Amino acid sequence: MKALIDAGVVKFGRFVLSSGIESPFYVDLRRALGHPDLVKWVVSGYLSALSRLKFDVLLGVATGGIPYASILGYLLQKPFGYVRAGAKGYGTMQAVEGADVAGLAAVVVDDVLTTGNSLINAIKAVREAGGEVVGALVFLDREQCGSQNVRRETGVEVFSVYKMRELLETLKPYIGEGHYRAAVEYLAKWSC
């Protein structure tokens, strides 16, 4: 697990997230892509979580979910594609690219879940393209109400490989008491 720190996947300090929320930690799973051993570990976690779901197609959420949905689709020999943040304004003007999803059971894959807005938008896009979303899968749920927001807005269950508190416990020996305490206190402020 120290490799997550060494590779810069998990960082501690002051960060502003894409949601505009300030956080004492940042998780950037894209950094794992430069480390094959970490990719193998991350994909193994995703595969374990996916074993609970029956689906036809995997769709990565742009951009963090795309590489992992692609790897998973290849390994499982399932069609895969991705969901853009918005439909492109040219060509076919689609929001869902790659695999055709019409009439298929889809799992939407993302890397990190905070508020759930990216997943909510992706689920809506898949439904608009005729797909049935049977689950959403993230590697890390930051435990900031994202899974509850997704369920409330879409009815879709979010599955995660890790919850942030679990990850913090695992990383505690490598991050120091101050960072650990700041992160735990920060998470305690979130009640869903």
From Swiss-Prot:
Keyword Transferase (UniProt): yes
Cofactor entry: Mg(2+)
Pathway: Pyrimidine metabolism; UMP biosynthesis via de novo pathway; UMP from orotate: step 1/2
Domain of life: Archaea
E.C. number: 2.4.2.10
Binding site for 5-phospho-alpha-D-ribose 1-diphosphate: 84, 88, 110-118
Catalytic reaction list: orotidine 5'-phosphate + diphosphate = orotate + 5-phospho-alpha-D-ribose 1-diphosphate
InterPro entries the UniProt entry points to: OPRT, Or_phspho_trans_dom, PRibTrfase_dom, PRTase-like
Binding-site residues, orotate: 114, 142
Cysteine disulfide partners in this protein: none
A GO molecular function held by the record: orotate phosphoribosyltransferase activity
A biological process term (GO) from this entry: pyrimidine nucleobase biosynthetic process
Quaternary data: Homodimer.
Name of the featured protein: Orotate phosphoribosyltransferase
Native source organism of the sequence: Pyrobaculum calidifontis (strain DSM 21063 / JCM 11548 / VA1)
